[in-house]
Amino acid sequence: FDDRIKAPRGPAWRYADVVLGAHRSGRPLDDQAKAFEKLPLEHLAERQARPYQREALDAWVANGRRGAVILPTGSGKTFVAELAILTTQRPALIVAPTIDLVNQWHTRMRAVFGVACGILGGGVHELGPITVSTYDSAALHLGRYGDRFGLVVWDEAHHLAAPGRIAAAECCLAPFRLALTATWER
């Protein structure tokens, strides 16, 4: 309970648990935390998931659309993320460790979803229904924008454990979370 606002309060990353708990118990919930709605998306790329990609996505969905996908380099983790974005139909934030990866993600997301995409990082500060950010920019800005995304994708998620970066994950209330990596070793 937060005496300053006279209401219950908790860490942003527990948002999904609070909403789900209220729903399951039948308690009314006046959700003033989230600043996102459904985002109707179509996948414009003509490509089918490989069996292991479908298995990874299905396991992620079965786990409440939260979890990690660990696949070797070049095995299509980006495509799994595309399917996750398509499945959730919510504004998404994709966080990558370098500006080169941010630019690759940005180009790919615009191509496969046909929507305006934003960038946070490398001197650019634009939000879109799908936004791509560096880890450092996410750490700086998610305190302000963490309520705008229903899904957060952490590319090269082993970088998340670096000092100062875990705070970005904690202040993002996205109920759906996907970590992508080829290895948990940093």
Specify the residue positions occupied by each region the protein language model found.
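Walker A/P-loop
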Residues: N63-T88, L93
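Conserved motor-coupling elements within RecA-like helicase/translocase cores
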Residues: G121-T131, G146-D147
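SF2 helicase catalytic motif II
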Residues: Y135-E185
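Interdomain "pre-motor" coupling segment immediately N-terminal to P-loop NTPase/helicase cores
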Residues: F1-K38
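Conserved pre-motif I regulatory segment
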Residues: K34-I70
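Hydrophobic positions in the central parallel beta-sheet of the AAA+
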Residues: V69, I94, T131-S133, V152, ...
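Conserved helix-turn-beta segment of the N-terminal RecA-like "Helicase ATP-binding" lobe
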Residues: V95, I99-V124
